[in-house]
């Protein structure tokens, strides 16, 4: 309206920001209560907007990618190399919290192999997307759209993407 008052325009993406009640009834919604807010995956049942245009769950890159970007001595959780490829604030702690709630006791997570950790985080990401997308679909016609974050990465990293940076086998979440 500031540039061209003759054209209709609606500010959006998102109109109200995640976590604000109006974001569930007007415009599109970014729901990050799962992941950034550490809410249970099932919380989305009561947090579905009219069009949910951003939400996600992290996972490690495919193990073959981890092997390509690390030396053998760096293939342990919390190595400097793996930490450099995890850019989300407290990313590993968030993943561990969800793994503990949904899959396995993480008390001894430091003793797990990176291969096992990768597998479990990808199972978690698949479980998250499958359930969240299922809830969104069940809310039709109230909810008429869902866009997950994100499709791909710009470098090999632990992230929200559902495809592998090197275009290998997609992560498990691809099939959700």
State the predicted function of each range.
Residues 2-20, 141-153:
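Aromatic-lined carbohydrate-recognition surfaces of secreted/lumenal glycan-active proteins
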Residues 23, 30-176:
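Substrate-binding clefts and catalytic carboxylate motifs of secreted carbohydrate-active enzymes
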Residues 5, 27-28:
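A general marker of short, structured functional hotspots
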